[in-house]
Amino acid sequence: MEEKFVLHSPFAPSGDQPEAIKALVDGIDEKKEHQVLLGVTGSGKTFTIANVIAQLNRPSLIISHNKTLASQLYSELKALFPDNRVEYFVSYFDFYKPEAYIPKSDLYIEKTSKNNKELEAMRMSAINALSIRKDTIVVASVAAIYGESNPKHYRQNFFPIEVGMQIDRKSLLLKLSQIGYERNRMELNKGQFDVKGDSIEICPGYVSDTNIRIDMFGNEIEAITLIDPLSKNVEGSRKNMTLFPATTYTVHENTIQNTVDLIKQELSERIEYFKSHDKLLEAQRIKDRTLNDLDSLLEFGYTSGIENYSRYLDGRAPGQRPYTLFDYLPDDSVIFIDESHLMIPQLHGMHNGDRARKLSLVEYGFRLPSALDNRPLRFEEFAEFKFPKIYISATPGDYELDLTHGEIVTQYIRPTGLLDPIIEIHSRDNQIEDIYDHLKEQIAKKERTLILTTTKKNAEELSLFLQEKKIKSAYIHDRFKIFERNEILKGLRMGKFDVVVGINLLKEGIDLPEVSLICVLNADSTGLMRDTRSLIQIVGRAARNDHGKVIFYANEITSSMRECIEDNLFKRKIQSEYNEKHNIIPKTIVKPIAPPIQNGILSEDHSKYYGEKDLSQMKHNKKFIDQMVRKMTQLAKANKFEEAIEIRDYLIEIGIELDK
């Protein structure tokens, strides 16, 4: 049966969307390698892309510049394509501090990290889906350019099974162990299996709502059943299926032995190099550290920092680029680069920073030179992938515009009929008093405000000044963690704050329809956040409200301001003429306030336990409550009392009565 994308939406494309969809689809059909979609804020670019994917019916990868935006895109596309595979691929670390050495202070910093098992499982689901299904969309962060296992090796570990298959139980269990599954007789977690009589129950290492039970009759598979992990109720059956590996880093014994031999050879050469340069400390250091790693590899098949030997494990030549998510994409895939004006510079910068850190480790004997091949893609390596690419932004960068020779697909009309905000220019003299007067008007109308300063100090001082004036104010800067920033912006939407002050509020990626006024202090100053693209992005923040307004505080009109204002007037003219022609009355976007986003998954602070859920319904979900109680009990038994208390407090908060 052909796997087709089926888009579910009560709305049809409107405004500029039909023309944009047609232009992009035609461009792909015409073999255009690069296209740019210039869509204003709130014009429904995600819906346009969803329609393009549905019409092309080709596997698609959407890359976003941060986990927050990636999570939003994932949620939106999952709702639009409930019958297809929509997957999520971001870093699986909740916390990560890389290994480093600082020569000036002779300080070695060991790698410390905390893995998120749910995100790890979601990554595996993404590469599994790309391997077997054409109707797959993957939403990824910059993690897409970091190393993954060799796709050839990974797919060799796929284990197809079917009813009637001749295989004895011992061979079946051995095969499960070879693809990374561990036996657990007590309680199954991801990547584990248990055997009871003639039945083998498997908890997949990837995202799955069910466990898999294989029933044997002698040396034959008699039945393959999908069962609920808790109740053990049968959810379905299969005549055949593919068991995917429990982890992406499943390594066979012969590969490990070959890897160890090659590492020993490089180690010998490196020791000789250090000795010939009279660096005896470095020679001894690299010898001790590497041999310790090799002992672990031989005994356990794993060592801390195993990624530094990925070149050997993957079978790559020195200097060969790493395997990444792109190597799992089918040949007819399409790549969408969201917020390309931010994503492209991010892709440019990742390799150099990584290499600079590792060079010190290699130079001072903490790592072998082959560790330099454990790296993200260089930008030119990313650019060499010949998949058609669509760059999406309200302010495309020079790179993507050069690739298309300035040709763009535009989307200026919003389905809501909203116009770009009015821009006013006020004097910088007495700008604080002027802002205070406007804030009083805003509060009277129960509308929200953003204020953009040029320094952290100014943001903090202005916020404190407003608080002294009894205005509910908060400030944001880059020392705040992502979920802290999102909590403040959620508070702004809910009315906990009347105004939020910050320097760069563009990277949040969160819609704020309640914001009808944006005040830009020192708009005529020079710098990154007052260039033309940044000013256009700032103006767009007030474009979700039917009487949005932006005030530039300036004593002169800079070229960036002039270009922004001209762009604003041009768009407003197109939008107002369209509204007049079609009798459309602009209307503020009404958007529900979603739970805060932490670690890239829509959830409350307890996301590490219960993943992405409609929290308002959780109290009535018996299966979910049972899972939480069970998890709480497990954590308590493992003496992880703080985490157990978190779950207990959450359950009490949503009204669940717990037995003592």
Swiss-Prot record:
One example GO MF annotation: helicase activity
A Pfam cross-reference name: ResIII
Domain of life: Bacteria
The UVR domain, residue ranges: 622-657
GO cellular component: cytoplasm; excinuclease repair complex
NCBIfam families assigned: PRK05298.1, uvrb
Subunit structure: Forms a heterotetramer with UvrA during the search for lesions. Interacts with UvrC in an incision complex.
Name of the molecule in the record: UvrABC system protein B
Gene encoding the protein: uvrB
